[in-house]
Amino acid sequence: MDLEAKEISGNIPNENALAELCRLCESADLSQIENFVGRYKNWCLSIIWPRNCWLRFTPRKDVAGYTEKMFEDMDDHYQGFVEKLCLLGTIQIPYRDVPILIGRSKRIFLHDLETDTLHFVCDNFEQFVRYGVLGTNIITCAEPVYRHGLYEGPRFESLENLMNNDVLRSPYTLNVHVKLNRKGVLGIKAMRKHYIAMLREFDELARCASLDDVGRFVSLNVGRDLRLDMPVFKSLTLGTRDSVWTGTCRLANLKEQEDLVEKVVVLGYLNDHDYESKCTRPILCIGKSGKIYYYDWIDNVLVKLGDCLLTFLRVGFARLFADYGYEKIGKISMRFGRMSTLGMSETYQSCMSLKIVPVCNDEFALSSCVPTLDFDVDVLSAAYGDGLEISSPGLRCCIAWPPMYALTLGEFYHFHTHRWVSAYDWSSLLDADEFMSAVGYAHPIYRDPNPDYDPYVMHTSTGKTIAVDTVTEKVYIIAESLVQFFNIGLRQFPPFAEAELDPEQEKMWFGETKCGREEFILLQRNLPAMKDYVAKHSGKRIRVDAFQDFDFSFCSLSDIYYLTGPGILEKITEKDYAIIGTCARSQAEPNCRAAIVMGSNCHIYIYVENKISKVSKSLRTFIRRGFDELLYKEKYSLDWSDDTLFYISDTETENLNRMLNGELPVLRSKPRHMCVRKDRLVKDRSKILFAVRLDEEDSPTVKFITKFLTPVFVGRLPATNRFVVPVSRARLTNGLQGTAAARFGIKGLHPSSDCLVWNILVDYEYETYKYPSTYIRADQIADMVKDLKFMDNFNEKWQCITKLAFLGLYAGASLFNFTSKPTLGYWCRYLSEYASMLLFQFESKLKELTKESTRQLGGYNLCHWGQELKDCLENKSDVFFRYDFFERIESCLIEHFMLLCGCVECRRMFIMYNKRGRKFDFGHSVRIQCFPMIGSIRLPAFLHLGEPYDVSLSSLIAKDLGLSMIEGQIELSRLPISLQISVTPDKKALLTFLTNIVFIVFVVNTLYRVINAELDIYYDLFTEEVGKLCVAMEEEMKLGRNGCLGDLCYFSPMKQMKEIVRCPGEKSQFILKCWEALRIGFSVPAYKDYDETPFMEMFFMHHLHIKRFHEDNDRDLVSCDNLIPGFFIVNTDGENFLQRLQRVVLPVVEDYLTNTRCINGTMAFFFSGLKYFGSGNHRGFQISPEKDVRAIAYKLGSLDVLRDDYKYYEYTPPDCPGELNGHGGDE
């Protein structure tokens, strides 16, 4: 009977019930959903489809024929252990009651009791209310028909009313004839253990969000075996399509199958004892939709094995070899790359780097019953009163862990239990003279304490915090002090160590890990590859926010030194362990860092006090959750004592805990922990102490500094001082490495000028800027060089060496090259290569014109390009740096538009151009903001520009010559400028190419004018300073003081160089000579041996902003008003900048590049390390000087693949994308 024929009435239990249920399902709060179902038991919610169906809220025990054992089996066998399923209710169909469940991922599922299969219904409860049960054959396969009056929206009715109106039957009469088809259930149970192991084995692969991520993971782990605990095949050896032997014909067959099925990525080949040759082994592939395919070289057919990786791991090869009833297992995981196989966290495809979001406990969605107080030592002291017993019981406080837990203070007898505190004094965790005092019960905030279930917290007379497991009566140390317990709560209480949190709570507590497929994460289960990665990236740091202000630094065994003697670490590596880094709080001294070790099982261990302790199951978990398994589990550690290896349990935790939390005493002897190698530390390890006066204690600056540098209270301080803040001299000296004096060898500058010079130079060293409009121009540099401030004790006559060093380094960086930096010369070369390619394509477009278009041109296209010009372009001469060539192709542009378009605008332009010739003005000029020295520039003649170029082209050119637009369009493999014109496609293509050629060549010529203008500025400065240097050196040689410069090798090359620089026509070579001037100048003893002690002291005073002078009786204390932490930049590189520069500079060879004649010989600096072209996703090729423009054309898709012509392109090895082959560049 239809609902519309019945008048069903009933009192809705709560008008906001549906909104409440939607909110609970959206937050996936399964415990609250169970409470909701219990409150609204036997109330029914109408659903839109199937018709006349109602969702009856009921617990599992009230579903007829649905036993607790059935639910546990389903939960266990069908990925429910990942979802943590919760029963919402049931839907009645004829003679059956079908359970509807919700998972921890908010998805809705349907459990078919007849086939014992879990079906995916929709993504969330809101979709379930809007659309009902669609897409499953369990209830109906018909499409819904919505008619007016049939469904009036979701509403509640009681089961009793619906039964009285014959809408629903009694639930106890249903499911009587259901017979479970448990085909193969015993086999499934036997495979479950292997299945869970394979989930962890394939976890990294399952987290991939796209085929590109899968391909990158496989390429990084080629040759790695993934275990398959299933029949037929025993392992999967990862390999790319190139590394898996295929053969030409078989590869073609695979491509044909891709065209028929979908695009796939090869995962590797399957191993079995019967396959001896790799060429006969079948391969496993994954498709764009996430499906897993089997490809055999005999049948040459892609056979689907599963809808997703999770299904394949559960089903195995059952579909291929036999039918054991597995084909419906794993249907719930239908989406590719969205959830990991462990179901813990989503994978975000848009993220490009690993980011740890700091933990913020204030973000919890607290209910109204949450206590307003946080547990604190002062709160506990107030509860004790005058004695050692709690005199004010019942006070409830929040604790840090687990989330939504509180601590109710009180003695045992306050909670009506027969336990006593003194009963636990016998514990072996306490010393003979130690005793315990009560604190209270820890329990969930929504209920009162359960004395026989909840843990009870106590603290000892020595400060340790103890927790009693009231279920097992075991005692555990959970913190070294009450302050630590305030910070970490019950983190180290074993029953709570594996506390299951819903995704939102876990994200709030541990923070959210967004992984963009970082290489070290992809290699976390590949120990040999991880060793290579650590060796290449030694010194790289990662933040670990499971603890406050904590970091992990990659380093290998050769990068650290153990203070207790040699041989200890080597024993670890002999036992299949590898050192991958160190960790500590960021402000800890280098010798307080603990080594992190990876085992053969890829678990993470910490090495402290001659033993290793397991802290995490994987590197990702370590970054996300810190020391997840440390101290609170009954694990075993390996301990090395001399030459004897034995096992001990994790009981000695005091030193380790203090080290990790920065609680080591101030006056401590040197700890026996990891430290940096001796050759990387300063030998003098004395302290510089900054005294803080009483009136400065509440200063915001002082409070800020003491967050980073721990204050020390010293009794011998004067009465006016409160405490001192120590900073090691090694830390300050390492900070000095971030100056121009130490990094670039530039000496004598005052700290203010030194900092300015360092900032300007280091921006180019680290490629901070991208376009010429973003960095300082030559005229500003000239003013800076003239205004540099020098130290008072620095001889004025050697200031020219400092200025030459700054001038040479900056001029070379901005105009030409430090390997692959984006300089002016870079853009000239980049765009001239592109223009050359466009000209060749323009010539090919001319040949493709129709007969009518060719006739319309009247032979103009054939006679215009002479053979001389073609030869010039073929040889890549200096044609793109000539203004006459630009005017020539501009006139060609106007004539082509007049002949092929013929509109009024084109004819008018052609007539005016013929009348006025080169004096013709297109209409306006533009003043380029980033190059003011060249004044206004006349824009080329552009006709029929498309949006947005007709409006914004002038502003783009004024800003950065449109370089950002040009590079962006080239990266997208299309022309920078498009046209809007009503002509045939072949004419439009021809005119578009010609317009872009004019635009590109205009930019090239403008940049070339800027290069010459800036060369003039730098050249004038250079000749002036070189003249001063020659005079100073000649004077030193004549005086002969201290025997310095007595050898003519210093002066003669400088004199020759001065004469060469002044020769006509050699101005373009002066930067090459500037390097010689630097080498000679840096060898001058007065400059080389300059005492930097005054500079160092002034550097500290300058950066610390020290204003007050210290008294005579406090010579070791420097008083200051303003302390600023974090200003030191540590130079971790082994060599300075000048040493690396000397390795980069190559000699200029006449035929190295033919078109360097008209620019400068120094363009070869740039050409020696031309930027690799593109984003790396186009077959990985790169451009080098000897490459032809065909390489660019190939990248843009205008040419076919160049197979054997190694002269024009080359492939970059997979492990070093984007590197420059054959040249030693910047690291």
Curated annotation (Swiss-Prot):
It holds the Pfam family Herpes_U5. InterPro entries: UL27-like_protein_herpesevirus (IPR010302), US22-like (IPR003360). It comes from the Viruses. Belongs to the herpesviridae US22 family. This is Protein U7. It comes from Human herpesvirus 6A (strain Uganda-1102) (HHV-6 variant A). The gene is U7/U5.
